[in-house]
């Protein structure tokens, strides 16, 4: 009886080690994919003048994936446990749905990575800065008082003769 338990224990240990090695390979692939994506983003971040189409596509894909998650959570008819089990185990397990689920999971991991979120904030700042400049120009084009126009522009240092003028009156 002891020999049978030892064989089962050895089989369990071998199974655990093999599954850990498979998981580490997929994690390494995900880290390599994420690193490649982030290096491409970092090198392209240097030219902030225009946002390339693949970056905007990636932002759109991430927002789409987040919308899918939020729609599934907004149904509210199911408890969270049922929703999680439905998400993990679809009704028809064919090769296409498994591959699609894996792709969506990888996209979620990339979109939720901290470095990508920081890059996304930088890109939003660049886009918002472009919009702010256009809004300032529109405000300036309207007829507004001179003082308000002066406040919109960056403050210039005061001229020295204005500061020295007070000493002449003493």
Curated annotation (Swiss-Prot):
GO terms for biological process: blood vessel diameter maintenance; negative regulation of gene expression; neuropeptide signaling pathway; positive regulation of gene expression; positive regulation of phosphatidylinositol 3-kinase/protein kinase B signal transduction. It comes from the Eukaryota. Residues 1-23 form the signal peptide. The record marks 160-162 as: Cleavage. GO terms for molecular function: neuropeptide hormone activity; neuropeptide receptor binding. It is found in: Secreted; Cytoplasmic vesicle, Secretory vesicle. The keyword Disulfide bond does not apply. GO terms for cellular component: axon terminus; extracellular region; transport vesicle. It holds the Pfam family Pro-NT_NN. InterPro entries: NeurotensiN (IPR008055). Keywords: Cleavage on pair of basic residues, Cytoplasmic vesicle, Secreted, Signal, Vasoactive. Interacts with NTSR1. Interacts with SORT1. Interacts with SORL1. Belongs to the neurotensin family. Neurotensin may play an endocrine or paracrine role in the regulation of fat metabolism. It causes contraction of smooth muscle. This is Neurotensin/neuromedin N. It comes from Canis lupus familiaris.
């Amino acid at each position: 009886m002891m020999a049978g338990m030892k064989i089962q224990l050895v089989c369990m240990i071998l199974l655990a080690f093999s599954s850990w090695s498979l998981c580490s390979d997929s994690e390494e692939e995900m880290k390599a994919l994420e690193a490649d994506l982030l290096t491409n983003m970092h090198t392209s971040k240097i030219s902030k003048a225009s946002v390339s189409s693949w970056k905007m596509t990636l932002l759109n894909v991430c927002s789409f994936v987040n919308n899918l998650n939020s729609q599934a959570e907004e149904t509210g008819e199911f408890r969270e446990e049922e929703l999680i089990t439905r998400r993990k185990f679809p009704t028809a397990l064919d090769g296409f749905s498994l591959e699609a689920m894996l792709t969506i999971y990888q996209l979620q991991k990339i979109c939720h990575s901290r470095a990508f979120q920081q890059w996304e904030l930088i890109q939003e700042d660049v886009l918002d800065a472009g919009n702010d400049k256009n809004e300032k120009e529109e405000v300036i084009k309207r007829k507004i008082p001179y003082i308000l126009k002066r406040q919109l522009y960056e403050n210039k240092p005061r001229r020295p003769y204005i500061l020295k003028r007070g000493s002449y009156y003493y």
